[in-house]
């Protein structure tokens, strides 16, 4: 069972080393889940003397005002033999055998965190391990003494600051409260009892300790309290007799003080019947045993919590991405990998693995054909317009057989209007591709880390799409112009021939251009234009896909990659200027993950179920 307390000690030290102090944080905390015994009391309650009595050594700083300004995690390790010594976690290679030096180091380490002349407090704990054959395996957290008034230039908030710190420790359900109260004061005014009652109203995890029993007024005693009648707790009260200030000034050692404490209870008529559960030695053994039981009961839940938290931290760490490489080659490789991830996401949208690419089909199947249908060819082929163009094309010499030049002008005037829908189709596909670029940007988690790289890649991709759009527009309009530039003669040769096709040259020009004749010309032209439109409905989508979609899949970032290989280290670093908040978050999560994995390994190595 002793290994269980050692296990918690080890995890507590790891928590402090890796920045988990249990205070409010956006990261999960393991510290708050560990069973601990917090020592709570007013500044004049005898709290320090109780701790020194349990340890059997003088090692705590003393003085007026607030002496304890940081939590002291006191880990006691029982050894079979050898000289007593102490170790601080912040000085791992140094053993202290002089406990006066331990006292000084506690003061110095407190000043390093809070400032030498400062009166402020800090939640960052000091870890002190004491190895001795005269102690039990136990961990105690010494907290600053509660006070009611700020003195000696202390900030006005110090009273509330201390109370908030103490409360933040003892309100946790895994915290065992050791409430120190002086017997020579009314228990109703006890700072320790007052605050412990607020967080543990039923007294289920509070141990009461009465100090200064030997200093009570003559004719009074603490029997009612010690027997649970004055203030009832789940666990029995423990009375202790500490060294007086005169004893401390005379350097009375702890062995003599413990002997005198035993003699006091054994010879006292009031407390003789309670001797077996009184005194600092009994207090230490009782707390050690209780802590072992609590730790064992918490281990299964702690394991589940650790496993769940490791999974959550790993997921977030993966989402945040890898840290930036230090060398130019590593940076270049990172950028290339991120760009490839983006490019792959973009291709998946086009290929149908992701949504969005189907909108291009909608342009070809719906938007483009509908735009052609909306072209008002009937206006171009109205009776007046046909007569006008035919007449203008004939010039001063009327046509002999068929008005070929008139036909050409009519067809050209219709086909030129197709340029509008063709350009609109090019622009519509361009707009869809740009939307897919922005969508792919948002879906490429790595790009979220690097705002500058995101802007550069987005700009390069859009520039490529713009170039492809321009090429596509040229190719698409060329298809339309080709239809205008060379007509399919065979179409007209297959048209039904009429005797009136050319008219009688001897008739007047107005007789020759009668309504029936002009209607036939308009009908023939419309049939030809419809044939051309049917062909363009097939060829224009092919041109757009070839020039825009296919090229976007094949070479979207080619120019960016070429320029990237020529960039210097400083410019590569600028592209990877990750948000400092993300960097800090990744570092914090990595440390916290290290803590949880270490705790998981430590727990699995302990045969706690035996």
Curated annotation (Swiss-Prot):
State the SMART domains in the record: DYNc (SM00053), GED (SM00302)
- Where's the Dynamin-type G domain? 31-300
Instruction: Recite the UniProt keywords alphabetically.
Output: Acetylation, Cytoplasm, Cytoskeleton, GTP-binding, Hydrolase, Microtubule, Motor protein, Nucleotide-binding
Question: Which segments carry the region annotation G3 motif?
Answer: 142-145
Q: Where is this region: G1 motif?
A: 41-48
- Keyword check for Hydrolase, yes or no: yes
- The ranges of region (G5 motif) come to 241-244
Region (G4 motif) location? 211-214
Reaction(s) catalysed by this chain, per the record, are: GTP + H2O = GDP + phosphate + H(+)
Keyword check for Repressor, yes or no: no
Q: Which is one GO molecular function term here?
A: GTP binding
- As recorded in UniProt, its EC number(s) are 3.6.5.-
**Annotated GTP binding sites:** 44-49, 212-217, 242-245
- Residues bearing the modification N-acetylmethionine: 1
Q: What is its main location?
A: cytoplasm
Residue ranges of the GED domain? 518-610
Note down the stretches annotated as region G2 motif: 67-69
What is its quaternary makeup?
Forms homodimer and may homooligomerize and heterooligomerize to form the phragmoplastin complex. Binds to PHIP1.
Q: Which family does it belong to?
A: Belongs to the TRAFAC class dynamin-like GTPase superfamily. Dynamin/Fzo/YdjA family.
Listed name of the protein: Phragmoplastin DRP1B
Which taxonomic lineage does the organism of this UniProt entry have? Answer: Eukaryota, Viridiplantae, Streptophyta, Embryophyta, Tracheophyta
Q: Which gene encodes it?
A: DRP1B
């Amino acid at each position: 069972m002793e290994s269980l307390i050692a296990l918690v000690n080890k995890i507590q030290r790891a928590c402090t080393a890796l920045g988990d102090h249990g205070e409010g944080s956006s990261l999960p905390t393991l510290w708050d889940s560990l069973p601990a015994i917090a020592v709570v009391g007013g500044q004049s309650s005898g709290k320090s003397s109780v701790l020194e009595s349990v340890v059997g050594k003088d090692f705590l700083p003393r003085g007026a005002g607030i002496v304890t300004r940081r939590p002291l995690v006191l880990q006691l390790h029982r050894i079979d033999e050898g000289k007593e010594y102490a170790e601080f976690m912040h000085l791992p290679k140094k053993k202290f055998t002089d406990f006066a030096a331990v006292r000084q180091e506690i003061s110095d380490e407190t000043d390093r965190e809070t400032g030498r002349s400062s009166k402020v407090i800090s939640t960052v704990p000091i870890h002190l391990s004491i190895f001795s054959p005269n102690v039990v395996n136990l961990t105690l957290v010494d907290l600053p003494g509660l006070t009611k008034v700020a003195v000696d230039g202390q900030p006005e908030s110090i009273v509330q600051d201390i109370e908030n710190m103490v409360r933040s420790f003892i309100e946790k359900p895994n915290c065992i409260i050791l409430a120190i109260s002086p017997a020579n004061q009314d228990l109703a005014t006890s700072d320790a009892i007052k605050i412990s009652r607020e967080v543990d109203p039923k007294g289920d995890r509070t141990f009461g300790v009465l100090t200064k029993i030997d200093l009570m007024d003559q004719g009074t005693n603490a029997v009612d309290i010690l027997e649970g009648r004055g203030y009832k707790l789940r666990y029995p009260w423990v009375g202790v007799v500490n060294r007086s200030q005169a004893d401390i000034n005379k350097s009375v050692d702890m062995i003599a003080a413990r002997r005198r404490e035993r003699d006091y209870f054994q010879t006292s008529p009031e407390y003789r019947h309670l001797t077996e559960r009184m005194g600092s030695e009994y207090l230490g053994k009782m707390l050690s045993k209780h802590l072992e039981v609590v730790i064992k009961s918490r281990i299964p839940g702690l394991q589940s919590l650790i496993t769940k938290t490791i999974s959550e931290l790993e997921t977030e760490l993966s989402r945040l991405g890898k840290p930036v490489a230090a060398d130019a080659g590593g940076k270049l490789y990172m950028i290339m990998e991120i760009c490839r991830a983006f490019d792959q996401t973009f291709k998946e949208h086009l290929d149908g693995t992701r949504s969005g690419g189907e909108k291009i089909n909608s342009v070809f199947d719906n938007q483009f054909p509908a735009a052609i249908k909306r072209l008002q060819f009937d206006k171009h082929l109205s009776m007046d317009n046909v007569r006008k163009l035919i007449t203008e094309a004939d010039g001063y010499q009327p046509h002999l057989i068929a008005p070929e030049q008139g036909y050409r002008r009519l067809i050209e005037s219709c086909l030129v209007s197709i340029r509008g829908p063709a350009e609109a189709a090019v622009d519509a596909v361009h707009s869809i591709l740009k939307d897919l670029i922005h969508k792919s940007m948002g879906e490429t988690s790595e790009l979220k880390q690097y705002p500058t790289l995101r802007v550069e890649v987005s700009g390069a991709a859009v520039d490529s799409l713009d170039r492809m759009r321009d090429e596509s527009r040229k190719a698409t309009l060329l298809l339309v112009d080709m239809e205008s530039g060379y007509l399919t003669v065979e179409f007209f040769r297959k048209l039904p021939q009429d005797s009136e096709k050319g008219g009688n040259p001897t008739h007047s020009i107005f007789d020759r251009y009668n309504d029936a004749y002009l209607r036939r010309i308009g009908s023939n032209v419309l049939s030809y234009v419809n044939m051309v439109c049917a062909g363009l409905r097939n060829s224009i989508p092919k041109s757009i896909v070839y020039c825009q979609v296919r090229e976007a899949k094949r070479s979207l970032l080619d120019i960016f990659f070429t320029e990237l290989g020529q960039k210097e280290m400083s410019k590569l670093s600028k592209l990877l200027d990750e948000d400092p908040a993300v960097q800090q978050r990744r570092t914090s999560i990595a440390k916290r993950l290290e803590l949880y994995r270490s705790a998981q390994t430590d727990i699995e190595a302990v045969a706690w179920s035996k």
